């Protein structure tokens, strides 16, 4: 008989960790030290649960790469003592944080499941309990004593996604996230069904490496009709800028104005990495498919293929932190490192 899985819940902040004080009509922090007392359904899950919380829980709008490092450090120091991890996080920036954690952890062999909620855990119609309970169940799921999941995932409203494939699509619906270019890894209904063929496999026994050096001197430039030379020029001349996520139209298309292409060329000559990512929710960048992307290809922009903007941001910070050569950066960005690209 296999031993009970031991799961660590890490509360960073967010709606899921709030309860309503009906006397004062305000939200207050949930007592995670008495988690099973407040959510007795957790006693039905065949696992042991411990909790840890940020000393000062964060609204996810205030999340910073330093906080990603903090989350990574908590998991790293507890890695050998637990079988899986559930990270509770505000939904607004969850895809950014979860994507970053996926890149920071090399040779991961245990589940790290991010979840949150649209309503506080104490609300009458809350989605928090189901998201939390099922995330713990997923993190504790094993076959022959080994975890079913060995990657960073995001669970929300009955679906488990690869974290670095997700994006938030709705501020009000319970179904707040989607994975536009990769199917769900598992679905929760009457039964919890894993799509085993879609999961990342832990193929080696190499020692866990946690990369905590992130360089956030990057920016997102979203192309729109009528964007001016002054705006682009001032943007590209920002001090200490190391990388740009260029959000283009469709399959990677952008204006062919001489001034625009010249500014991009100047940025590249200064050693700034430019990654072409589509503005579309789904689909992929295919540089050279149309005339309006041929010149971007000739300039040497990096294709983001079907990566999400959130994942591109996290991946760029991670790769910049490795201090690679330009060619190494280019090759690794265009390579699927954690299942973020098709």
Question: What is each of the regions a protein language model found here?
Answer:
Residues 1-77:
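ATP/NTP phosphate-donor binding region
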Residues 3-4, 10-14, 32-43, 162-251, ...:
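Accessory alpha-helical/coil subdomains and C-terminal extensions
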Residues 12-14, 90-91, 117-120, 249-250, ...:
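Short, ordered loop/turn segments at secondary-structure junctions
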Residues 18-19, 93-98, 131-132, 253-255:
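Short glycine/serine/threonine-rich phosphate/pyrophosphate-binding segments
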Residues 82-94, 239-252:
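Short acidic, glycine-rich surface-loop motifs adjacent to enzyme active sites
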Residues 88-110, 256-263, 292:
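Short Gly/Thr/Asp-enriched flexible loops that form oxyanion-binding sites at enzyme active sites
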Residues 114-189:
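Internal gly/pro-rich beta-alpha loop/helix module
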Residues 248-342:
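C-terminal non-catalytic interaction/assembly regions of soluble proteins
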């Amino acid at each position: 008989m296999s031993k009970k899985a031991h799961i660590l819940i890490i509360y960073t902040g967010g709606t899921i960790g709030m309860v309503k004080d009906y006397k004062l009509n305000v939200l207050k922090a949930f007592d995670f030290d008495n988690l099973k007392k407040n959510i007795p359904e957790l006693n039905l899950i065949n696992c042991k649960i411990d909790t840890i919380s940020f000393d000062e829980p964060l609204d996810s709008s205030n999340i910073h790469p330093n906080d990603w490092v903090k989350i990574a450090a908590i998991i790293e120091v507890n890695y050998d003592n637990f079988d899986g991890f559930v990270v509770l996080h505000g939904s607004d920036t969850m895809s950014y944080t979860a994507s970053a954690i996926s890149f920071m952890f090399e040779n991961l062999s245990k589940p790290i499941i991010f979840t949150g909620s649209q309503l506080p855990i104490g609300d009458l119609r809350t989605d928090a309990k189901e998201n939390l309970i099922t995330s713990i169940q997923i993190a504790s799921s094993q076959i022959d004593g080994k975890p079913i999941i060995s990657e960073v995932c995001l669970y929300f409203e009955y679906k488990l996604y690869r974290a670095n494939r997700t994006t938030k699509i709705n501020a009000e619906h319970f179904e707040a996230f989607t994975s536009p270019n990769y199917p769900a890894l598992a679905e929760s209904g009457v039964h919890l069904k894993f799509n085993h063929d879609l999961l990342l496999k832990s193929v080696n026994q190499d020692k866990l490496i946690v990369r905590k050096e992130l360089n956030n001197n990057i920016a997102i430039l979203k192309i729109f009709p009528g964007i001016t030379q002054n705006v682009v020029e001032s943007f590209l001349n920002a001090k200490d800028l190391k990388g740009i996520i260029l959000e283009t139209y469709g399959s990677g298309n952008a204006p062919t104005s001489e001034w625009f292409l010249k500014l991009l060329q100047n940025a590249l000559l200064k050693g700034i990495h430019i990654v072409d990512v589509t503005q579309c929710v789904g689909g992929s960048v295919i540089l050279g498919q149309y005339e309006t992307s041929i010149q971007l290809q000739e300039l040497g922009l990096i294709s983001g293929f079907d990566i999400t903007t959130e994942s591109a941001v996290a991946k760029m910070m991670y790769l910049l932190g490795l201090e690679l050569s330009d060619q190494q950066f280019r090759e690794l960005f265009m390579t699927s490192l954690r299942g973020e690209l098709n």
